[in-house]
Amino acid sequence: VGVDMGSTKEIQTRMKSIQDTMKITNAMYMISSSKMQKAKRILSDTEPYYYNMQAAISRILRHMPDTEHPFFSIRHKIAEEDRKIGCIVVTGDKGMAGAYNHNIQKMTEQFMAEHEHCKLYVLGMVGRQYFTKKHMDIAENFPYTVQKPTMHRARLISEEIVRAFLDRELDEVRIFYTEMQSAVAMEPVNMQLLPLKKAEFLPNQATVSYTHLTLP
């Protein structure tokens, strides 16, 4: 059976298009793989500091269980329905991330539907655009992206959140983020940051080795 020239040319064009798409896909895979490895290195560098801080707080509370600090202030006198809650929402800057952004956005929306007085502190352009379109209460002085995170930026973010908590603009602070369980499994998480819960700093969690530094 003969094939006319038009059909042959169309097939060749389709084949070239598929090959070009494969090249682009492979390039995107290599870039994302490189970024993933870099992110994992940064995480492994940061985790020891995080867990050692937890262990240090645990040791302090073990020896001084009655310690009072504003970060532990539960503010019992404020009714649950009247509590002002700050929600730090971590999303991506781009939409090509599957369910990554969708799951966090839906979890945040569900939480806000159950709590009346919520203020959003959104990290990432996708989340900011999403919640802006829905006319939700977003902190305007919080224009942070998630590309190339640095300690300086993290310090600026934490200073703003801590200030709002200590000034009683917020009674509670929560963070909504994605926990990476493996390269293919990720789980959205809703975690309370402030006030700190003493029960979470139990002595048996202080399993990290430590060194005392004595300064003059």
Model-derived features: positions:
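C-terminal beta-strand-loop-alpha-helix "lid" module of Rossmann-like NAD(P)-dependent dehydrogenases
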Residues: 2-213
